């Protein structure tokens, strides 16, 4: 099957935003105008096309990023819908990895919310070119220019308006286009009919001022435009668009547009901007990877004539076809029914069917080409972040890093007969979501699930019931504490010697143990010289230490951020074995960690509460009562924003408490910030449990 759209006319974009900025509605409208959906779904009715999992429709939030295809002006646009809720940032990170450009959506009233900052930082990390759309211009308190200021202050973005609104709130009627210097006014409710007219008199002066700002911003990035601008020459629309496109692709400028997706205004102009300014797969640097055979770096250019390479970025359990693997093709062509090589795992798999997903129906494809996003049926052993490629030209593309879960709960089926069903279902869900982990507690035999927050785990339990028909009970959430040491201890001995009749055991090690900075993990340094311990036993010593670290020395939590130097020891010709050295390593670690002033660390969350003035005192008092550390306050519209660091252990049930304290008028977001030592009195409680 030949390529349907040239690479130059393909756009892979994501829509990133804070919860409630109107992302799903905007995507809906895009699908409507590009002719793929005939009746628009409203999130308020739970009918939006993108939100295809049932719980999303109930909660009105988007959880999984479905990849959807549509066309506009002879271009193919693949949209990845990304969730905006803090517990799902991993989904966002995962989708940013496979996009070429993004639309950052802001609410005209709320502006830059905490989650927008997180997502923006993630997009900076992957150098994603973006344009911004200030949505909800029809809402009370909408202020386009304030949002621009917030983008500059809070995100450090070089935000340049390409449009200004005509009116706002109920009087929002249209848009002034600063690139073409005319106005767009809408003729009907569906916003399909609009016309370009002269800029209304009372907006002329403001339009000219912002046009000047636009030209100034562009001339700083483009010398030719700078010359023309300084000499007062006319700059054509095409020249302006070309320079703007370059600025966006270099991630030096963020053009800002405005509109109201709900009222169907501004969406077509947003689609035009996607085509004018966001990159095609050819405009982004070729993807880099490592050849697993030679361990050398290689690149894959976006082109059908290159060897096939793709990245699996999402796994979903689909009720009709089983496991769906969403993947992005970076180079080459893939035929349905052919074999691919999973270079991350080192084995071959056969692709069954290839589906191009539209939000609620799917189209079968015989083949997919460089730059395409599609879903494959039949890949049994491929996980998120795996590379799929041509076996004769293997490459491993950089995988994604996922944060460790911060919260865990025990889970059990309501009837014991469903235990196997539960285990299978949890395994399927863990395959889909790398930040969701399942393990069995060896001491109690309980199944423990871990995730990124209460909502994350609630959604999982919800899905168990709906998709897998397993009714489960969950225990009280537990915090993922860690342990570490605070001082260096040298010459710690670990001896494991049993020499009484028969084959003996002999392992003897001497180590230094010292703390590392937060987040540095575990470092093992081998300084054995002169064969004091034979080479083949060294890995066993490390294994013994790593295993002992899993259960810490204070309260059974994993020990982190420490360095062990193996410096001496002794062995016995006959009695030494890997097992003996493994046990010696573990004895030395426990001994050393006990002496190195161990402490318990707890996860501290970055909490932001948006609260009406009159409840401010109660909210701050409550945060202090939760061992919170208030970092600052600022006004936002008619509310106050309180920022604080609060231990996760104190945040359980906060949503309910906050609702009752403020009659439901305050909202909060929290995300993991860092670990810090627990106060002594609380450490005693934790150890005593």
Swiss-Prot record:
Gene Ontology CC terms: cytoplasm
Domain of life: Bacteria
Gene Ontology MF term list: GTP binding; GTPase activity; translation elongation factor activity
Family matches, as InterPro entries: EFG_II (IPR041095), EFG_III (IPR009022), EFG_III/V (IPR035647), EFG_IV (IPR047872), EFG_V (IPR035649), EFG_V-like (IPR000640), EFTu-like_2 (IPR004161), G_TR_CS (IPR031157)
Subcellular location: Cytoplasm
Keywords of the record: Cytoplasm, Elongation factor, GTP-binding, Nucleotide-binding, Protein biosynthesis
Domain tr-type G, residue spans: 8-282
GO biological process, one term: ribosome disassembly
Span of the signal peptide: none
Keyword Metal-binding: no
Binding site for GTP: 17-24, 81-85, 135-138
Keyword Cytoplasm recorded: yes
Family named by the database record: Belongs to the TRAFAC class translation factor GTPase superfamily. Classic translation factor GTPase family. EF-G/EF-2 subfamily.
Protein role: Catalyzes the GTP-dependent ribosomal translocation step during translation elongation. During this step, the ribosome changes from the pre-translocational (PRE) to the post-translocational (POST) state as the newly formed A-site-bound peptidyl-tRNA and P-site-bound deacylated tRNA move to the P and E sites, respectively. Catalyzes the coordinated movement of the two tRNA molecules, the mRNA and conformational changes in the ribosome.
UniProt protein name: Elongation factor G
Species of origin: Halothermothrix orenii (strain H 168 / OCM 544 / DSM 9562)
């Amino acid at each position: 099957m030949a390529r349907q759209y040239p690479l130059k006319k393909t756009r892979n974009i994501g829509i990133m935003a804070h919860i409630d900025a109107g992302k799903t509605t905007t995507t809906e409208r895009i699908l409507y105008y590009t002719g793929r959906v005939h009746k628009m779904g409203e999130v308020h009715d739970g009918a939006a096309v993108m939100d295809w999992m049932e719980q999303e429709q109930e909660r009105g939030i988007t959880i999984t990023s479905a990849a959807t295809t549509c066309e506009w002006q002879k271009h193919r646009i693949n949209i990845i819908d990304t969730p905006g809720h803090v517990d799902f940032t991993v989904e966002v990170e995962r989708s940013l990895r496979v996009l070429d450009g993004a639309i950052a959506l802001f609410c005209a009233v709320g502006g830059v919310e905490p989650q927008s900052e997180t997502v923006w930082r993630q997009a900076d990390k992957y150098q994603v070119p973006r344009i911004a759309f200030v949505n909800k211009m029809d809402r009370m308190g909408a202020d386009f220019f304030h949002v621009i200021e917030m983008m500059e202050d809070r995100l450090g973005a070089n935000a340049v308006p390409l449009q200004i609104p005509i009116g706002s709130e109920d009087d929002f009627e249209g848009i002034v286009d600063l690139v073409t210097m005319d106005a767009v006014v809408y003729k009907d409710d569906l916003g399909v009919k609009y016309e370009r007219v002269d800029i209304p008199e009372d907006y002329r002066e403001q339009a000219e001022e912002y046009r000047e700002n636009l030209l100034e911003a562009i001339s700083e990035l483009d010398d030719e435009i700078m010359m023309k601008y300084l000499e007062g020459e006319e700059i054509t629309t095409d020249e302006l668009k070309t320079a703007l496109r370059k600025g966006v692709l270099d991630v030096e400028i963020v053009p800002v547009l405005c509109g109201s997706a709900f009222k169907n205004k501004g969406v077509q102009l947003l689609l035009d901007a996607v085509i004018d300014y966001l990159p095609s797969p050819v405009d982004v640097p070729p993807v880099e990877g490592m050849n697993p055979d030679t361990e050398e770096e290689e690149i894959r250019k976006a082109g059908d004539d290159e060897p096939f390479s793709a990245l699996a970025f999402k796994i979903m359990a689909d009720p009709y076809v089983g496991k769906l693997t969403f993947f992005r093709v970076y180079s080459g062509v893939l035929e349905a029914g052919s074999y691919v090589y999973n270079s991350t795992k080192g084995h071959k798999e056969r692709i069954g069917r290839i589906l191009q997903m539209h939000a609620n129906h799917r189209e079968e494809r015989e083949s997919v080409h460089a730059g395409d996003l599609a879903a494959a049926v039949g890949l049994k052993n491929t996980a998120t972040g795996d590379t799929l490629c041509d076996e004769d030209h293997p490459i491993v593309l950089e995988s994604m890093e996922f944060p460790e879960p911060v919260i865990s709960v025990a889970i059990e089926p309501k009837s014991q007969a469903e235990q196997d069903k539960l285990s299978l279902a949890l395994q399927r869900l863990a395959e889909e979501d790398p930040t969701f982990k399942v393990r069995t507690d060896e001491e109690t035999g309980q199944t423990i699930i871990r995730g990124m927050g209460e909502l994350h785990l609630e959604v999982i339990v919800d899905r168990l019931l709906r998709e897998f028909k397993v009714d489960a009970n969950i225990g009280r959430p537990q915090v993922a504490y860690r342990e570490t040491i605070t001082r260096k201890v040298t010459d710690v001995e670990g001896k494991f010697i049993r020499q009484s009749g028969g084959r003996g055991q002999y392992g003897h090690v001497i180590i230094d143990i010292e703390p590392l900075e937060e987040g540095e993990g575990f470092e093992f340094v081998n300084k054995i010289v002169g064969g004091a311990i034979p080479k083949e036993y060294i890995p066993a010593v490390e294994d013994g230490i790593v295993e002992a670290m899993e259960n810490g020395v204070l309260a059974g939590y994993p020990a982190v951020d420490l360095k062990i130097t193996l410096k001496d020891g002794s062995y016995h010709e006959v009695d030494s074995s890997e097992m003996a050295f493994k046990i010696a390593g573990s004895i030395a670690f426990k001994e050393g960690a006990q002496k190195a002033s161990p402490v318990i660390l707890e996860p501290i969350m970055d909490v932001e509460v948006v609260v009406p003035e009159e409840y401010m005192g109660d909210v701050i008092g409550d945060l202090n009562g939760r061992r919170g550390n208030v970092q600052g306050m600022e006004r936002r519209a008619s509310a106050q924003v309180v920022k604080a660091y609060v231990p996760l252990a104190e945040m359980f049930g906060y949503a309910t408490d906050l609702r009752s304290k403020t009659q439901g008028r305050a909202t909060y977001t929290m995300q993991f910030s860092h670990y810090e030592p627990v106060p002594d009195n609380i450490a005693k409680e934790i150890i005593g449990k």
